[in-house]
């Protein structure tokens, strides 16, 4: 069902633009984003002002998706991709995978030097020639390989291609090799790191995390004294600071060899950075734990926990808590003995700005319970996000939470545990709080996983629409199912099936079989990232032809994900003849086990869910993706208005059937096409 859209007030405000294409671009982004648009003058804009407005509202242009973009001619798609690169726009995996396929279909892959590095990660590596191999790998190695979390085969192939460019596996990676490999070193084994040129530290700095074995390799390399900062006994503050986050992985054994004054100076700098928000508490606490462990045996004046609880170091005062070496002078036993409740009540904030070890956090929590036996006041809740994980559901039930700001602070990513989400939200709802779209965006999509079914029902459809595209891949399957039901209820009346898919896509991990069959008939060409996050049991029930139709032009990406646990499960449910027709012709399990990169967290527990009885609420740990932004201002003038409309919101007439969505998935409505001169009244790009 489609309805003619009346011109919006926002649309009329951009009518004075010099370029019709740019005028339409601003009109669409403002209309699609609603209240997010800001600073658009009522009297119209000239071309210069329009460019400024777009620069200030880049986040409005993040709604790129491949289905309408697939209609762009080669030259205009090329311009779009180059614009993404020049503006350093960070797309998500689901956008990049299909965009890479569009580029390949139009022969744009050879222009890789002008493309975003993240896009190169998704290209067909078999098309990379010997002559441009090194240039391709070096450019791709500036990207974020975490985007390939759901494409294990592509991640392994990327590393193999890189080593092939070097002439095969090396016993020792040289400085020039490491320059070429960039972030790809993060997927290499510890043995290769130990034997590499010491400049490998620059590569490791780009790793989002180090494995246990890589951490050991780092410490071996640092202990050798071959790096630029020399042996541990000669380290200085500048050298340690040059290590960046790598310094937080230094072992207690190495800290024992560092000059005491240098170690203490670095300790001060880490605590100061943590206080200033320049270093995460997680990273700071890793360093503090290692450093204090190295000092535990050398500080003989510290009393042992079981030898008495007298205060040896002196009573803790406000001035003491502002000392960046506070944790060096007071271990957790002395914190318990020397910190009075009066000082704690007046100085809770400066105390919790320190990256306290877990044992010290428990001491502080116990003292707060003495001060506030009937629950912590709301103004104090704002100060304790680092302690929230220690509180039981019963204790949270004593809190008075009346502000959405309090909820945001308590449910920040590094605060409450997942299973505390429901209790915190319930205290807010008990005080007539409202779960808004802004609140959902602020606390993150994964928090949706842990809301009760009743709480989900409290979310108004208008607010649910404003929640954006949350990443619910970490959710237990039962919650994914519930979230799909909620999302389907909200979006089911979307008249255009393409737009419906765009809105429902983040929730398809809980979609039933009939929904996926409906989408397969609709020719939406599901991206591989969304496909690998489908319910494994539902996916297992899909036939080869259904999967072929569901993936459409992205079918070739199955080979890049063939060792993903969910794809393995689906492949095992079909015969090899059918799979061979799709290019999936060898046993997946053996390759999966042998080729897993060290930083790939497999198998995710979504595979375990598939083997559990229905209703199992185990937690999946599939990682999410970086934030998305889209910018292609340079195309605003170049593209015809009709193509801008196509790119942002609408498909051309005849490309996609429209269907009035009812409570259950349904087949495409026969003959229900959207006329070119009509636009569905509810438009959200």
Swiss-Prot record:
Record-level GO BP terms: cell adhesion
GO cellular component terms listed in the entry, alphabetical order: membrane
InterPro entries, A to Z: Mesothelin, Stereocilin-rel
Membrane topology: Single-pass type I membrane protein
Annotated keywords: Cell adhesion, Glycoprotein, Membrane, Signal, Transmembrane, Transmembrane helix
Compartments, record wording: Membrane
Pfam families (UniProt xref): Mesothelin
Residues in compartment: Cytoplasmic: 649-685
Secretion signal span: 1-32
Stretches for region Disordered: 603-624
Protein role: May play a role in cellular adhesion.
Name this polypeptide is given: Mesothelin-like protein
Natural source organism: Mus musculus (Mouse)
Gene: Mslnl
